[in-house]
Amino acid sequence: MRVILLASFAMLLSTLTQAQDINMPPQNPYLANSSYSMGHGNPSQQDAVSQSGPSGPSQTLRPDQIQYQHTGPAHFGAATSGVYPDGKRVFWSNGIDRIVKIDYDSWEVVAEHFFPGAEVYDEERANESIAEFNANNSGVFALARTFREMGKLRDLSNIYTVLGQDHIYYVGSKTGLITAYGDADPNDSHSAIIKKAEFQLPPELTGPVMGLNMTYDGWLIVATEHGYIAAIKPDFTESYFIRLQFSDGAEEKETGATGRGWIRNGFAIDDDGGIYIASQDHMHKVIWTGEGLSVDAKEGAWTARYLNSWGEGTGATPSLMGFGEEDQFVVITDGEDLMNVVLFWRNGIPEDWKQLQGAPDRRIAGMLPVDMGDPELAALQSEQSVVVKGYGALVVNNTPRNIPWYLPEQASTLMISMAGSHPEYQPYGVQQFVWNPARQRLENGWVNTDISSPSSVPMASMKSDRVYVIGARDNQWTLEALDWATGESEFYYVIGGQRYNVLFSGTLLDEDGRIHYGTPWGRVRLNTKIEP
């Protein structure tokens, strides 16, 4: 196993012992009372939870350890509800054609709501596709099938969601429609899914919805691809709007289909009203005052440029680092061909802070290249947000090992989607960076070049002090568990073939520490024993 420890011994020792001292982001009381109420977990977007995860040992999972449900395609995440009056929890999840509720204990689908007018993808069609990719997920014919299968994602309209403390599930669509769904019987977790209310963004707020989050006083925050920000009261009776700085002409700045516009991803929120949004060339802090939105520096707002020679901007959702008395940052990867991990001072910049060499803005506190331990590496990009745990920031390599000569470079996403587990294409590399508060600088932590995470969003566990990713070995999908402090592989589970492709989904932990994630056609949970 090749793990490169890049930190000093003193820094490594500090990292090893910091788990017990980490400040977690505060719980938002208006979100579901669980560890995962929205994409990336909570408003801070860290992809880190407090509970333990699996602890091994390495094994090939038995069929009775794998719980799979057909949900239709593109269920990339699932929000965990709080406890209902009937004593149960459910998972809420949505995709191209439907919303589902899955029982927390049994993993059975207990309710479905199909989107009007959407093509319905049944299980027979799913099984045919899975069988084709199990037979062959490499070569020209497999790529043709991949084009066909990935083409249906163009119909994905409702990707960003938030689950409230009252079991209301908010869904933002690319048409600017925010819909609140709930239970036909609020006391029955298994009751039918019904539409409660709708809010349509005004026509002048153009662009698909590219993020949905909730402030710590319970207001929904929405961002559109063209740089408009909305604050909406959860009962949809009041709203405020603002446009980000430097967004003039954003309608003409997309570099591809939806998801390649001026704003490409979701955003983070802190408990003081700070909203952190990445646009094509800038990181923005917008202030929610409780009575409106502000981009005024006098209110604490700011805008800072980051490097973007690639031209498409960051592929990362901003993640917050540091709470309480800790140094506080917002973290992204930038738009360089060889991307950097970039830390911005979240609030005031220290008076004696000097602008870093090569950094385009004084607000940047740290900027290091993601080179996977190879100083000769010329290009690497990722579509995943930066996983943050304590002062650690972790990224994965999503650049395929090979791209067939007849495909343009822009088609690289295809190679890590339906073909992501194939040894010919699968990317390798996980890298961690660490903020050193004593030296006030960002440092390299470690690199593991033996682990492949083709397209999954990793998840860190505070209690286990591990990071989990859905990886691949020998064209089989796996769960990989790495020591957060050292990067060493602790164990792995072999899950199986193409039914269990992670396809850009989050690697999630439920309240009891069981791994679950989305697949091309459903959702799967690994029902293995978890140490308390």
Spans of features found by a protein language model:
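Loop/turn-rich, solvent-exposed surfaces of beta-rich toroidal or solenoidal domains
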Residues: F329, Q381-S489, Y493
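Structural motif
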Residues: I96-W107, T175-D185, H226-K233, D281-W288, ...
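Sequence/structural signature of beta-propeller modules
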Residues: A19-V140, D166-I168, T528-P532
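Repeated scaffold domains used in trafficking and secretory/extracellular systems
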Residues: P73-G82, E119-A131, R148-T161, P203-N213, ...
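Asp-box/WD-like beta-propeller blade repeats and closely related beta-sheet repeat scaffolds
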Residues: F133-N158, T175-L177, G182-T215, D235-R264
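Long, internal scaffold/assembly segments composed of regular secondary structure
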Residues: F267-A379
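Residue-level detector of Asp-centered blade-edge/turn motifs that repeat once per structural unit
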Residues: Y84-G87, L163-D166, M214-D217, I269-D272, ...
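Blade-level signature of beta-propeller repeat domains, shared across WD40, Kelch, NHL, RCC1
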Residues: V502-P532
